[in-house]
């Protein structure tokens, strides 16, 4: 499916130079002299290389056809992270590279969206918020309750999240999967 250069948005998957590229950032530029163009920062899905490319206003790009599928995370082993398709119950193993540092938000039975291109996984989308249990938290400092101070806490999945002073080990909290920030108690 062809789209105009001005319709390219972050998150789009483009077929460009015989590869699949995920759009990270777009900037519309209208210089004082010359034609308008779109500056696009992209990442190659297969190789992981980044590219800054300039597309003229009249150019059309090929947008990749992506099929989203809801899958459930089961477990991790030496081969990778195992997911089950909710429609046909087939299992799919994804590598850590494909999950792009999002493994710290995966708990068994978490539903995520796996994006497929020609029946091949090209990326995942986590739910915007997950509930994690605090495994370890630094002790709170007495008298620090008036200020909005934070302390680091290790979650059950191994990631570290900055939490308010009143959060203790054993409590469940809601964490934003986009930036890894504390939202509130669960």
Swiss-Prot record:
Instruction: Please give the family membership noted in the entry.
Output: Belongs to the elongation factor P family.
> What protein is this chain from?
Elongation factor P
Signal sequence bounds: none
The listed locations are:
Cytoplasm
SUPFAM superfamilies given for it? Nucleic acid-binding proteins, Translation proteins SH3-like domain
InterPro entries the record matches = Elong-fact-P_C, NA-bd_OB-fold, Rib_uL2_dom2, Transl_elong_fac_P/YeiP, Transl_elong_KOW-like, Transl_elong_P/YeiP_cen, Transl_elong_P/YeiP_CS, Transl_elongation_fac_P
**Classification lineage:** Bacteria, Pseudomonadati, Pseudomonadota, Acidithiobacillia, Acidithiobacillales
Q: List the keywords (alphabetical).
A: Cytoplasm, Elongation factor, Hydroxylation, Protein biosynthesis
What the entry says about post-translational processing?
May be beta-lysylated on the epsilon-amino group of Lys-33 by the combined action of EpmA and EpmB, and then hydroxylated on the C5 position of the same residue by EpmC (if this protein is present). Lysylation is critical for the stimulatory effect of EF-P on peptide-bond formation. The lysylation moiety may extend toward the peptidyltransferase center and stabilize the terminal 3-CCA end of the tRNA. Hydroxylation of the C5 position on Lys-33 may allow additional potential stabilizing hydrogen-bond interactions with the P-tRNA.
Cited PANTHER family: ELONGATION FACTOR P, TRANSLATION ELONGATION FACTOR KOW-LIKE DOMAIN-CONTAINING PROTEIN
Alphabetized Pfam families for the sequence: EFP (PF01132), EFP_N (PF08207), Elong-fact-P_C (PF09285)
Report the residues modified as N6-(3,6-diaminohexanoyl)-5-hydroxylysine: 33
Question: In which organism is this protein found?
Answer: Acidithiobacillus ferrooxidans (strain ATCC 23270 / DSM 14882 / CIP 104768 / NCIMB 8455) (Ferrobacillus ferrooxidans (strain ATCC 23270))
- Pathway(s) per entry: Protein biosynthesis; polypeptide chain elongation
Q: Identify the main location.
A: cytoplasm
- What NCBIfam families does the record tag this protein with? efp, PRK00529.1
